[in-house]
Amino acid sequence: MHLLVRALVEEMAGRGVPHRVLTMSPPKVPKDIRIGQRIKVHARRLPVLPIPSDLEGYFGLVGAWAKGSLLWVLRNRKRLRREIGARVHAHCDGSGAAAFYPYLMSRILGVPLVVQIHSSRYLSQHPTTLFERVTDPIAKWAERHAVRKAAAVLMLTDRARDEMRRKAQLPAERVHRLAYLASDQFKDADTEARRAELRERYGLDDRPIVLYVGRIAAEKGVEYYIEAAAELTRRGRDCQFVIAGDGPARPDLEKLIGARGLRDRVTITGFMSHEFIPSMISLGELVVLPSRYEELGIVILECMTMRRPLVAHDVNGVNKLIEDGTTGIVVPPFRTPEMADAVERLLDDPELRERMAENAAPLPAAKYSLSAAGDQLAGIYREIGL
């Protein structure tokens, strides 16, 4: 289960709302588990061919989950109608299947549909492979159809909310902004012991760390971070570059690191459990967000919470969250020299880093708390009669 999905499910379960969660079926994980008294998790998917995809890991993986979940709903529809009788709440990642199959489930069960868009194929995602270009019109249609049929649509930013209202021709009262951190106690997980453990585990010394946190996937643009690292190295900067994450594009990224002669400067941690992320961020002097598209970027809020400035591509809604020169630096996308310049500017000016961190620190708690998101979602459920 995705971290943000689990956080919201547990928040709402704590308010008395029972959940059945249909998620991926990883190897060697029980297909049916219970979390507390109000959460039941069912992991289902059909088999897929091992054809790599930078977007999904394997081609058709999200569709295989969606079809497997739909079959489970069909087989259990009588029991679900009696037991749930409330809503289907879909968390959408930019694939058409993640929106369309929950729409079918809502029709089968005769309940309202709530669509929560974490990444939108219809509004912002762009295909990166031939297969994705071929299927892109279908995926866009599927997402658009689902949001038009939904009782409520939840977007990450005001910009995305307004654009979805306009493009999908939806009434304003059906489309809302909902964004939140996975924990209101995120900063509390940072400890000196965890920082020391991370330094020892990954061989990090006292040189400045320029950090990337997130998935290694096509849409995240991590190759631009590597190109900036190469440019900074050519300029004589003695930095450590740490990629805290993993993902389907890692093999290609490792080839690029080798081609740029950076194997002794770049560390890829692989998957990192969430309790270590605050300490990893605190080890960095700054964090780079090189995404090709990014409506919100939860890592932005996490870095603000940990008082670390960001250098980010000016894509989608990023400049609505990072005020250039005040709470971070926003650079033109896909231009290595400008990104390297911004990183150097922050490395050379500790007072600027501290000032940006000070300006940004209050924002996450003020506008993106998990408890406030729970209040808002409870209100939305009431509005649609749940």
Curated annotation (Swiss-Prot):
<protein>
    <recommendedName>
        <fullName>Alpha-D-kanosaminyltransferase</fullName>
        <ecNumber>2.4.1.301</ecNumber>
    </recommendedName>
</protein>
<comment type="similarity">
    <text>Belongs to the glycosyltransferase group 1 family.</text>
</comment>
<dbReference type="InterPro" id="IPR001296">
    <property type="entry name" value="Glyco_trans_1"/>
</dbReference>
<keyword id="KW-0808">Transferase</keyword>
<comment type="function">
    <text>Glycosyltransferase involved in the biosynthesis of kanamycins by catalyzing the transfer of the hexose kanosamine from UDP-alpha-D-kanosamine to disaccharide precursors. Can also use UDP-alpha-D-glucose as sugar donor with much lower efficiency.</text>
</comment>
<dbReference type="GO" id="GO:0016758">
    <property type="term" value="F:hexosyltransferase activity"/>
</dbReference>
<keyword id="KW-0045">Antibiotic biosynthesis</keyword>
<dbReference type="InterPro" id="IPR050194">
    <property type="entry name" value="Glycosyltransferase_grp1"/>
</dbReference>
<dbReference type="Pfam" id="PF13579">
    <property type="entry name" value="Glyco_trans_4_4"/>
</dbReference>
<dbReference type="InterPro" id="IPR028098">
    <property type="entry name" value="Glyco_trans_4-like_N"/>
</dbReference>
<comment type="pathway">
    <text>Antibiotic biosynthesis; kanamycin biosynthesis.</text>
</comment>
<dbReference type="Pfam" id="PF00534">
    <property type="entry name" value="Glycos_transf_1"/>
</dbReference>
<keyword id="KW-0328">Glycosyltransferase</keyword>
<dbReference type="GO" id="GO:1901133">
    <property type="term" value="P:kanamycin biosynthetic process"/>
</dbReference>
